[in-house]
């Protein structure tokens, strides 16, 4: 489990991408990802879904560019170009994959199609949003309403956040709303933040303890000599959890649990369970999912028909927001029908001219 956590911490870039959605006046959409691909994928021009968070299938148009350069080139990258870039990167002690941005773009006819094609692989989880779109036509204007929602993942955790946070505290800690510090001094605001940070650390430790504890109970028959009776072990649940939270905090997933439990119970009877990858697989998966979600960052931009040159929405979707609630990215836009105003003006002018002609004839 420690190795798994260390590996996840070393690949934070694997859970970071850019995502741009453009809503067109005809009600169709364009979606574009900004990705980091390794050298093998750059040269082959084939995206390997097993290596990437963004899962691509279907007719995506792939291009690449050097960071800071607006010129895009078709993927795959030819080997000579790659070698030249690799040499430049060696001189600056960087990597080609950290210097190149790959764009994957695709056009969609409906909100259903774009939602179906959006899949983010985060740990063992696959995140798929619900997307709704409404286009309302009126004589003077057309209104567009777009909403993309990523579902809450609180059911993934053994200990609910409500045991450590109020509803408002959850909102503030994970999304910034409501703002609990707006009327406070800097020192008062810091006190609030430090208190919530401590509660968050306790919640992390409580979850890690609970899933580990349940795994031990499920495999209790495989405990070694010196193990307590199962009834005695159950009776120590609250005491062990309190000790685990106090000692581990936010670093719970990095703990050597076998050593910790040996010190608590003065026996290594549970070491064989805690060190068995098969018996602890569910624990490892949930820890990995939590860490992957904590690293998830999607730089999101939404362009609406009325704001073709500037994004109507520019934000960062963090995976940690999904611990407490769903994350909704939305915007609306109204496009005026210039021709209707021209038509009305022409009608009024025609009526005025007609009235003048009638009066002149009299």
Regions found by a protein language model. Give the residues of each.
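Start-of-domain marker
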Residues: 12-84
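General N-terminal targeting signals
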Residues: 34, 46-48, 317, 346-350
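Sec-dependent signal peptide recognition
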Residues: 1-2
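Short, low-complexity, polar/charged sequence segments that are solvent-exposed and flexible
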Residues: 51-53, 123-126, 350
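Juxtamembrane interface at the cytosolic side of transmembrane helices
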Residues: 350-362
């Amino acid at each position: 489990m420690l190795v798994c956590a260390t590996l996840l911490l070393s690949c934070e870039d694997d859970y970071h991408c850019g995502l741009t959605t453009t809503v067109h006046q005809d009600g169709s959409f364009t979606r574009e990802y900004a990705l980091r691909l390794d050298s093998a994928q750059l040269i082959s021009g084939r995206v390997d879904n097993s290596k990437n968070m963004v899962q691509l299938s279907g007719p995506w148009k792939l291009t690449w560019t050097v960071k800071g350069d607006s010129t895009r080139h078709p993927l795959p990258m030819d080997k000579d170009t790659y070698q030249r870039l690799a040499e430049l990167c060696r001189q600056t002690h960087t990597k080609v994959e950290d210097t190149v941005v790959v764009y994957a773009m695709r056009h969609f006819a409906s909100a259903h199609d774009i939602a179906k094609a959006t899949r983010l692989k985060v740990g063992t989880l696959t995140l798929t949003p619900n997307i709704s779109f409404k286009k309302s036509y009126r004589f003077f204007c057309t209104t567009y309403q777009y909403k993309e929602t990523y579902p809450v993942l609180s059911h993934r955790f053994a200990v609910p956040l409500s045991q450590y946070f109020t509803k408002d505290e959850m909102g503030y800690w994970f999304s910034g709303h409501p703002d609990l510090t707006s009327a406070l001094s800097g020192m008062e605001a810091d006190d609030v933040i430090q208190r919530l940070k401590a509660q968050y650390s306790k919640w992390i430790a409580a979850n890690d303890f609970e899933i580990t504890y349940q795994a031990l109970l499920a495999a209790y028959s495989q405990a070694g000599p010196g193990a307590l009776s199962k009834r005695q072990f159950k009776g120590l649940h609250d005491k062990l959890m309190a000790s685990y939270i106090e000692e581990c905090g936010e670093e719970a997933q990095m703990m050597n649990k076998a050593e910790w439990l040996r010190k608590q119970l003065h026996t290594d009877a549970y070491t064989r369970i805690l060190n068995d990858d098969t018996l602890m697989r569910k624990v490892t998966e949930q820890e990995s999912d939590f860490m992957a979600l904590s690293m998830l960052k999607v730089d999101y931009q939404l362009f609406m028909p009325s704001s073709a040159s500037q994004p109507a929405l520019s934000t960062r979707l963090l995976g940690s927001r999904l611990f407490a609630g769903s994350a909704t990215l939305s915007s609306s836009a109204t496009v005026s029908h210039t021709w209707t105003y021209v038509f009305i003006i022409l009608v009024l002018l025609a009526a005025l001219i007609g009235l003048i002609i009638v009066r002149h004839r009299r």
